[in-house]
C-alpha cells in the first residue's frame, strides 16, 4: 500500500500526509491504510478548491489557465493539511474578518462566496451513514458537509453541492480510479475492511523477514491508468505558495 500511495499521489500530498501522521505519533509505513485515506482526503480537498475563483464583481468563476494579472481571489481557503496551530490561526482570522461563527472542530475549507466552512468527507461506506456520523460529530448547522464515495455517490447539506457538476465529476472520477487501481493490486479489500488490513499487515511483515534462500523483487512499474490519470490536478500557479505555507515547520 505504501508503494501505491507514493506512486499514485502528488508528492506534496504525500509530504503533507506524512507530516500530519507524525504530528499524532503515527507511522505511515505501519498504518498504510490510514496513510492512503489521508492522502485521498487531502487530494479531494485540493481538487475541490482548484481553479475556482471570485472575480472583482464578487462572482464565482472557473479559470484553468488565464491572465495571471487578473483581479481574482481564490474562492476556497484550504485549512486541511496545515498543522493544528496554523489551521486554527487561519480559522480565527476568517471568523474575525467575516463575522462567521467559529466552529468547534477544524473544518477542511472555507467558501468565501457562500461565507461558510466546509467539511469534506471521503468514505468507503454508504454516504448517508457517513454523513450522519459527520453531522452528529459537528453538531452545527453553520458548517456545510459534503461527502464523496469511491463508487461515485455524494451527499451534501440540503442537497447543496457547492461546485458545478463538471468539477464534482473530476473528483468522482479520481476516486473511482484510485479504487480500481487498489483493486487491481489486491489492496482494496484490506483498505475497506480493518480485519483484512490486519491480516495483510501480518502477511507483509512476514514477507519482509530476511530470507537467505531468496530475494524479493519489487516492481515499481506504474500501470497505464495511473500514467494517464496521474494527479496533474493541482493548480500550478498555486503549488509553490502552498508548499511554502503548508510545509513550513513551526519554530519550537
Curated annotation (Swiss-Prot):
Pfam families: Flu_PA. The record marks 202-203, 206 as: Important for efficient shutoff activity. One of its GO terms (molecular function) is RNA binding. The probable endonuclease active site in the N-terminus and the basic amino acid cluster in the C-terminus are important for the shutoff activity. The C-terminus acts as a nuclear localization signal. The C-terminus is recruited to host protein complexes involved in nuclear Pol II RNA processing. The active site is at residues 80, 108. The gene is PA. The lineage of its organism: Viruses, Riboviria, Orthornavirae, Negarnaviricota, Polyploviricotina. It comes from Influenza A virus (strain A/Gull/Minnesota/945/1980 H13N6). This is Protein PA-X. Its main location: host cell. GO terms for biological process: viral RNA genome replication; viral translational frameshifting. Belongs to the influenza viruses PA-X family. It comes from the Viruses. Keywords: Decay of host mRNAs by virus, Eukaryotic host gene expression shutoff by virus, Host cytoplasm, Host gene expression shutoff by virus, Host mRNA suppression by virus, Host nucleus, Host-virus interaction. Plays a major role in the shutoff of the host protein expression by cleaving mRNAs probably via an endonuclease activity. This host shutoff allows the virus to escape from the host antiviral response. Hijacks host RNA splicing machinery to selectively target host RNAs containing introns for destruction. This may explain the preferential degradation of RNAs that have undergone co- or post-transcriptional processing.
Amino acid at each position: 500500500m505504501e508503494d501505491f500511495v507514493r506512486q499514485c499521489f502528488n508528492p506534496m500530498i504525500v509530504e503533507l500526509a506524512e507530516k500530519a501522521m507524525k504530528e499524532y505519533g503515527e507511522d505511515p509505513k505501519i498504518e498504510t491504510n490510514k496513510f492512503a485515506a489521508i492522502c485521498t482526503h487531502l487530494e479531494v480537498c485540493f481538487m475541490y478548491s482548484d481553479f475556482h475563483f471570485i472575480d472583482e464583481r464578487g462572482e464565482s468563476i472557473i479559470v484553468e489557465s488565464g491572465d495571471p494579472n487578473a483581479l481574482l481571489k481564490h474562492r476556497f481557503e484550504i485549512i486541511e493539511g496545515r498543522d493544528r496551530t496554523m489551521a486554527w490561526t487561519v480559522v480565527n482570522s476568517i471568523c474575525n474578518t467575516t463575522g462567521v461563527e467559529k466552529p468547534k472542530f477544524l473544518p477542511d475549507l472555507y467558501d468565501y462566496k457562500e461565507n461558510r466552512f466546509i467539511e469534506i468527507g471521503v468514505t468507503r461506506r454508504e454516504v448517508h451513514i457517513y454523513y450522519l456520523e459527520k453531522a452528529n460529530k459537528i453538531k452545527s448547522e453553520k458548517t456545510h458537509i459534503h461527502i464523496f464515495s469511491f463508487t461515485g455517490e455524494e451527499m451534501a447539506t440540503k442537497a447543496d453541492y457547492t461546485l458545478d457538476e463538471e468539477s464534482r465529476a473530476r473528483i468522482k472520477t479520481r476516486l473511482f480510479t484510485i479504487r480500481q487501481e487498489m483493486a487491481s493490486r489486491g489492496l482494496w479489500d484490506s483498505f475497506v475492511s480493518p480485519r483484512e488490513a490486519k491480516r495483510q499487515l501480518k502477511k507483509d511483515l512476514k514477507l519482509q523477514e530476511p530470507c537467505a534462500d531468496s530475494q524479493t523483487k519489487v516492481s515499481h512499474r506504474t500501470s497505464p491508468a495511473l500514467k494517464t490519470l496521474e494527479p496533474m490536478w493541482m493548480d500550478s500557479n498555486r503549488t509553490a505558495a502552498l508548499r511554502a505555507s503548508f510545509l513550513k515547520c513551526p519554530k519550537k
